[in-house]
Amino acid sequence: LLSALINRMKEQLRIGEMDVDIETSLDAQRVADLTGVESIQIHNCGLCHIDADMVSRALLEYDTENLDLLILENIGNLVCPAEFDTGAHKNVMLLSVPEGDDKPLKYPLMFQVSDLVMINKIDTLEYFDFDFELAKERILKLNPNAVVLPVSAKTGEGLEQVIDWIMKEREKL
């Protein structure tokens, strides 16, 4: 999903990407290979999160004056990342259909701190017991200001709406 979004935006914006993981640089390398944008890996030494200080140190590797958008892909769980401020202007999270529409009930903080929630793999709705409207209702009950968008990385559905949101929010900064 991230690579698909970057590939659609990179003609309009100068984009950088940071990937956070415990070990390896596989994710950063994958993003760089698929998109051609500079991507660096932040190794978090076994922690389940990163914070603004770690991001600040990683920013030294970028010429931020020549970036229009810097994307930080945090650790992929729904608990720890919500508890720590990364210094990001906006928080975006990804919930996929196979994970279930009950995730907002189980991990409320992540949904409370997210500005945009993308519900991915909507092309698989017929195969899973996932109620999109119920998931959206649960998210908005926790965070009335959140924007909830259905997307499919596979088909591209919804990606233009995500890009529109990113562009509008970027203009507000």
Tell what function each PLM region has.
Residues 1-89, 102, 111:
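Nucleotide-state-sensitive switch-loop elements of NTP-binding domains
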Residues 81-98, 107-119:
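Inter-motif core of Ras-like GTPase G domains
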Residues 17-19, 93, 117, 150:
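Structural beta-sheet core signal
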Residues 75-77, 97-99, 123-124:
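Short glycine-rich anion-binding loops that position phosphate/pyrophosphate groups of nucleotides
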Residues 106-130, 166-167:
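N-terminal/domain-start segments enriched in small and hydrophobic, helix-friendly residues
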Residues 21, 73, 120, 135, ...:
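Residue-level signature of catalytic and energy-coupling elements of molecular machines
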Residues 25-29, 103-107, 131-137:
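Short, glycine/polar-rich helix-capping loops at beta-to-alpha or helix-loop-helix junctions
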Residues 124-173:
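Canonical P-loop GTPase G-domain recognition
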